[in-house]
Design a protein with these regions (language model features):
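Juxtamembrane inter-helical linkers in multi-pass membrane proteins
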Residues: 173-186
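Alpha-helical transmembrane segments
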Residues: 66-80, 143-160
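Hydrophobic alpha-helical transmembrane segments of multi-pass integral membrane proteins
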Residues: 39-50, 75-83, 112-126, 151-155
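Membrane-helix interface/capping segments
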Residues: 84-103
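Membrane-interface helix termini and inter-helical loops of multi-pass transporters
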Residues: 55-65, 96-100, 129-141
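Transmembrane alpha-helix/helix-exit interface in multi-pass inner-membrane proteins
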Residues: 152-174
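Hydrophobic transmembrane alpha-helices
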Residues: 42-52, 64, 68, 76-78, ...
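Short, Lys/Arg-rich, polar N-terminal cytosolic tail immediately upstream
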Residues: 1-28
Length: 270
């Protein structure tokens, strides 16, 4: 399976490097390159910000509100992500994404626009959170050694799940690469291999593990873990519906034989 993932990564890199069409010129070329750079830069910074700030229990964030203002500001930051994220994945949200950007390529750039917005949402959440400075002591000393390892493993699983799902979609590259290649975006086949052969939603499951295995537990992190953890559990219900519409009977068959987020079938068979 490692060879398959390596091939996917190399194919993804090749796709970005060889997708240029001579027919794409002028402002369209500039838009494609600008969206691509913006997308991957904000995505990378957002991921680093998530890993770093949750590692320290949100105590290194740069928000400076206190008291009631901190509660209101932090509440807005934590709620905006699941609400806007879910809306943009809905039918109405997709229509809005189709209008965000230059008129002639906005629809093709929709997946890239979505990734840029999601990355900015995460950046705002993790960079501008106002720390409460309420830190909880670990009940057992050994947790201080185990949790960082589990946290690291969770992020590795998330990276693997992202590769298995298809880097072109998950990274937002599908949109700008399609514009650069002068073709309509073509979504990859339904992922069924790797972690997707065990559960239907390994990305959500991996991120759930990340938010509950943070090495530093604070009042702030508790709130973040509760809200984002709940989102990871319930958001895949809506994703099941979207995938059912996109893939039809193929997804129904896959859904009937593959567990939601816990590999119960695999556990029973071992």
């Amino acid at each position: 399976m490692a060879d398959v993932r390596t091939k996917k990564i190399l194919t993804f890199i090749e796709l970005m490097l060889t997708s240029f069409s001579p027919k794409v010129k002028g402002t369209t070329l500039i838009y494609a390159i600008f969206y691509g750079i913006t997308c991957h830069l904000t995505f990378a910074i957002a991921v680093i910000a998530m890993i770093y700030h949750m590692f320290y229990g949100m105590q290194k964030s740069f928000g400076n509100f206190e008291g009631t203002l901190a509660i209101v500001a932090n509440g807005a930051l934590i709620i905006q992500f699941p609400l806007i994220h879910s809306f943009l994945l809905s039918k109405r949200g997709q229509k809005l994404l189709n209008f965000l950007g230059p008129k002639n390529v906005a629809r093709s750039l929709a997946t890239t626009s979505f990734t840029i917005i999601a990355s900015m949402q995460l950046l705002f959440l993790f960079m501008f959170w106002s720390p409460s400075k309420i830190v909880y002591e670990m009940p057992y000393e050994f947790l201080g050694y185990i949790l960082p390892i589990l946290y690291f493993i969770s992020w590795i699983l998330l990276i693997i799940a992202t590769i298995d799902a298809g880097l072109e979609v998950q990274s937002g590259a599908l949109g700008w690469v399609s514009v650069l290649a002068n073709r309509k975006p073509i979504f990859p086949p339904l992922p069924k291999k790797g972690l997707y052969s065990m559960i239907r939603h390994p990305i959500y499951a991996s991120f759930f593990l990340a938010v509950i295995t943070v090495p530093s537990w604070t009042a702030d992190q508790l709130v973040v873990s509760l809200i984002l953890g709940a989102y990871c559990i319930f958001a895949p219900i809506l994703k099941d519906r979207r995938l059912m519409k996109r893939y039809g009977d193929e997804y129904l068959k896959y859904k009937n034989i593959t567990p939601y987020m816990i590999p119960v079938k695999n556990i029973k068979n071992t």
